């Protein structure tokens, strides 16, 4: 597979075209951002860690019949993926109150929820990725009702698979965000699943093992990501 021109650069990844019009190469960077890009930094080897973590988790989901854009890991920093048309939504899955939801609703972080909460965020940096509801998404043409149902059904299955997987590793899956795209008119999971996109707490100590360590200047960010990869690799 021949690597071509860079066609997109985001906060954490670069996307390159290939000699196959249906495939791209995704490169994972060490750049770290928080608060919609207001806080910026670098975490040594973060790209390597997130590539390895995401590759393992996407392989797990594929084995459990979740369609994804992932094809294979090429090297420490790169994956071969299907070229998808990204749907400009983030689906945020909240199993435990934390982060912005806890602040917004006046809940103590770590409060158990009586049901898992799904939130939608409209992916638009200029607007600060606002929270929207299903009606907004349909009204402004982001997705149809049928597409939202597919996305929610997939999201529920992904949450079940990942929550059980992490529980076996001694990790609480507090919340996470997902992105989806269309490949030949089929909705597939895209982007990444990593400590950049999940809140992951040690099940015994509640130690944070995710990007909150960067957001909140807690230190030992790389070590937390390494611990997640170690537990996944030892499984």
UniProtKB/Swiss-Prot annotation:
Pfam assignment, any one: SAICAR_synt
Entries under InterPro entries matching the protein: SAICAR_synt/ADE2_N, SAICAR_synt_PurC, SAICAR_synth, SAICAR_synthetase, SAICAR_synthetase_CS
Any one GO molecular-function label of the UniProt entry: phosphoribosylaminoimidazolesuccinocarboxamide synthase activity
Any GO BP: cobalamin biosynthetic process
Catalyzed reaction equations: 5-amino-1-(5-phospho-D-ribosyl)imidazole-4-carboxylate + L-aspartate + ATP = (2S)-2-[5-amino-1-(5-phospho-beta-D-ribosyl)imidazole-4-carboxamido]succinate + ADP + phosphate + 2 H(+)
Signal peptide stretch: none
Presence of keyword Ligase: yes
Keywords from the UniProt entry: ATP-binding, Ligase, Nucleotide-binding, Purine biosynthesis
Source domain of life: Bacteria
SUPFAM superfamilies: SAICAR synthase-like (SSF56104)
Leading EC class: ligase
Pathway(s) the chain acts in: Purine metabolism; IMP biosynthesis via de novo pathway; 5-amino-1-(5-phospho-D-ribosyl)imidazole-4-carboxamide from 5-amino-1-(5-phospho-D-ribosyl)imidazole-4-carboxylate: step 1/2
EC number of this enzyme: 6.3.2.6
PANTHER family: MULTIFUNCTIONAL PROTEIN ADE2, SI:DKEY-6E2.2
Family affiliation: Belongs to the SAICAR synthetase family.
Protein name according to UniProt: Phosphoribosylaminoimidazole-succinocarboxamide synthase
Species whose genome carries this gene: Clostridium kluyveri (strain ATCC 8527 / DSM 555 / NBRC 12016 / NCIMB 10680 / K1)
UniProt gene name: purC
């Amino acid at each position: 597979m021949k690597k071509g021109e860079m066609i997109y650069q985001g906060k954490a990844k670069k996307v390159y075209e290939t000699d196959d019009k249906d495939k791209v190469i995704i490169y994972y960077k060490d750049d770290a951002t928080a608060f919609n890009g207001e806080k910026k930094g670098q975490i040594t080897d973060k790209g390597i860690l997130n590539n390895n973590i995401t590759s393992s988790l996407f392989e797990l989901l594929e084995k459990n019949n979740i369609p994804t854009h992932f094809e294979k890991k090429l090297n420490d920093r790169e994956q071969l993926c299907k070229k998808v048309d990204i749907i400009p939504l983030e689906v945020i899955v909240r199993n435990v109150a934390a982060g912005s939801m806890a602040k917004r609703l006046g809940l103590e972080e770590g409060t158990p929820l009586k049901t898992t909460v799904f939130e939608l965020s409209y992916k638009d940096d200029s607007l600060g990725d606002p929270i929207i509801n299903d009606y907004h998404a349909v009204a402004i043409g982001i997705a149809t009702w049928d597409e939202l149902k597919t996305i929610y059904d997939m999201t529920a299955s992904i949450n079940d698979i990942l929550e059980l997987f992490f529980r076996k590793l001694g990790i609480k899956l507090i919340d996470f965000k997902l992105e989806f795209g269309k490949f030949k008119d089929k909705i597939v999971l895209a982007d990444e699943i990593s400590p950049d996109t999940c809140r992951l707490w040690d099940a015994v100590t509640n130690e944070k093992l995710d990007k909150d360590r960067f957001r909140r200047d807690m230190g030992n960010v790389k070590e937390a990501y390494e611990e997640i990869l170690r537990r996944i690799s030892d499984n």
